[in-house]
Amino acid sequence: MSVAFASARPRGKGEVTQQTIQKMLDENHHLIQCILDYQSKGKTAECTQYQQILHRNLVYLATIADSNQNMQSLLPAPPTQNMNLGPGALSQSGSSQGLHPQGSLSDTVSTGLPPASLMQGQIGNGPNHVSMQQTAQSTLPTTSMSMSGSGHGTGPGYSHSGPTSQSVPMQGQGAISNYVSRTNINMQSNPVSMMHQQAARPTTTQRRVEASITRARRPLHDGPGWQGGSMMGQRPMAPYRPSQQGSSQQYLGQEEYYSEQYSHSQGSAEPMSQQYYPDGHSDYAYQQSSYTEQSYDRSFEDPTQHYYEGGNSQYSQQQAGYQQGTAQQQTYSQQQYPNQQSYPGQQQGYGPAQGAPSQYSGYQQGQGQQYGSYRTSQTGPSAQQQRPYGYEQGQYGNYQQ
C-alpha cells in the first residue's frame, strides 16, 4: 500500500497545488485515525505500516515547505493538524512543525501552572515563575525567598531571617501583581477584594490553606509560640488596614488575608477578625486578639526570642507588657503614647510622615533596618506598644520574608 501511494504521489514542484496538499492532509488525518484505532485494538503491525505512510507524507510536506517559500501559506494547517497526531507526526513534521511543538509545550506548561504564568506575566521575572511553581508544591519557604529576591532588591534580607510563606506580604508591597499572584496561590484563587468578606465568613478553602501554611511554617516556630504567632498575626492586621498608604495597602491585603486564616485556625480569633476589620482600629485588634488569650501572649515570648535574637530582652519585655492586661494595652495605645499615635490611628503608624511610623514606612519598603529601628524605638513602654507591631510585622513581613 505504501508503495502504491508513493508512486501516486506528485513529484514535481509545479504539480503541487492547494488541492493536492489538502488531499494529502485529509489522507494524513485518515491515517492518523486508523493508527489510533489499531493502537486501541493492539494491532501493532498495522500501526507501523500506517505510521510509515504518514511519515512519508509529512516528510513530503516538509520538503515542499523548505523548497518553496510560497507554499508556506498553504502549510500552516498540516503542522497544526499533525501536531496532535502522535509520535510519528512530531518526529517527522520537519522544520515548519518543529516550531509548533514548542508552542504547544509552552501552552501546556502555562496552562498547567496558571499561577506561575500569571506571575511571570505580571512581574516579568523568570525567578518568579520558578518560585510560583515551588509555591504550588507547598515549598513555601523556598518560594518566599526566591520571590523576595526577584521581586524586591530589599526582600532577600527578610527571606534569610524567616523564609516562610509569610514573605508574601512583602511581595505585595513591591507590586500588586506580585501580591495578587501570591494571593491566588495561597488563597486558592480567592480575589483580594473578597478578603474582607472572608474575614467575616471563613471558608473551607481558607481553613485548608491556613492548615497547609501552618504545617509549612511550624518548623520555624518551635513550641506553643507558633499558635501565639498566628494569633499575633491578627493584631497587626487591623492596624495595617487603616494605614493603607501607598504600598502599605498591598501589604495590608496580605496581612488581612493571613489574619483571617489565623483567626479561623483559632476559634476565639474569628470574632476578632470580624470586629476589627470593620473598624480597622488597633484598639480593637489589641483588645480582642491580645487579650482574648493571654496565654497566647506568653507563648509569644519563645517565638520572639527566635525571631528577634538580637533584641530578645526588649521583645520579651514588650510581651510582658502585653500580658499585663487589656486596660494597660489600651492605655498604651491611646494615652501613654500620644506621640506614637500609630496605634490608635494606625494610619499614622504606617504613615512615613511620623517619627515612630518611620519604622513602619521602612518596613513597608522591605528594608532590613526595620529590626534595628524596632529595637531602638522599643525602649521603655513605647517598646511594649510597638512590640505587637514589631513582632507581627516581623512575623508577617520582616521575618517571614
Swiss-Prot record:
Residue window of motif SH2-binding: 50-53, 358-361, 396-399
Gene assigned in the entry: Ss18l1
Residue segments, region Necessary for nuclear localization: 339-401
Expression across tissues: Brain (at protein level). Also found in the heart, liver, kidney and testis.
Biased composition (Basic and acidic residues): 295-304
Quaternary context: Homodimer. Dimerization may be necessary for its function in neuronal dendritic development. Interacts (via C-terminus) with CREBBP (via N-terminus), EP300 and SMARCA4/BRG1. Interacts with the nBAF complex. Association with CREBBP facilitates transcription while the association with SMARCA4/BRG1 suppresses CREST-mediated transcription in resting neurons.
GO cellular component terms, semicolon-separated: condensed chromosome, centromeric region; kinetochore; nBAF complex; nuclear body; nucleus
Region (N-terminal auto-inhibitory domain): 1-148
Residue positions of motif SH3-binding: 376-384
Origin species: Rattus norvegicus
Stretches the record annotates as Necessary for interaction with CREBBP and for the recruitment of CREBBP to the nuclear bodies: 392-401
Biased composition regions of type Low complexity, renumbered to the chain: 85-106, 138-149, 310-374, 389-401
Domain of life: Eukaryota
Keywords tagged on the record: Activator, Calcium, Centromere, Chromatin regulator, Chromosome, Kinetochore, Nucleus, Repeat, Transcription, Transcription regulation
UniProt-listed GO biological process terms: chromatin organization; dendrite development; positive regulation of dendrite morphogenesis; positive regulation of DNA-templated transcription; positive regulation of transcription by RNA polymerase II; regulation of dendrite development
Protein name: Calcium-responsive transcription coactivator
GO molecular function: transcription coactivator activity
Family assignment from sequence similarity: Belongs to the SS18 family.
Localization per Swiss-Prot or TrEMBL: Nucleus; Chromosome, Centromere, Kinetochore
Record bears the keyword Calcium: yes
Pfam families linked: SSXT
Start-end of Polar residues biased regions: 128-137, 260-276, 285-294, 375-387
InterPro entries listed in its UniProt record: SS18_N (IPR007726)
The protein's role, per its UniProt record: Transcriptional activator which is required for calcium-dependent dendritic growth and branching in cortical neurons. Recruits CREB-binding protein (CREBBP) to nuclear bodies. Component of the CREST-BRG1 complex, a multiprotein complex that regulates promoter activation by orchestrating a calcium-dependent release of a repressor complex and a recruitment of an activator complex. In resting neurons, transcription of the c-FOS promoter is inhibited by BRG1-dependent recruitment of a phospho-RB1-HDAC1 repressor complex.
Region (Disordered) residue spans: 72-171, 214-401
Region entry Methionine-rich intra-molecular domain, spans: 149-237
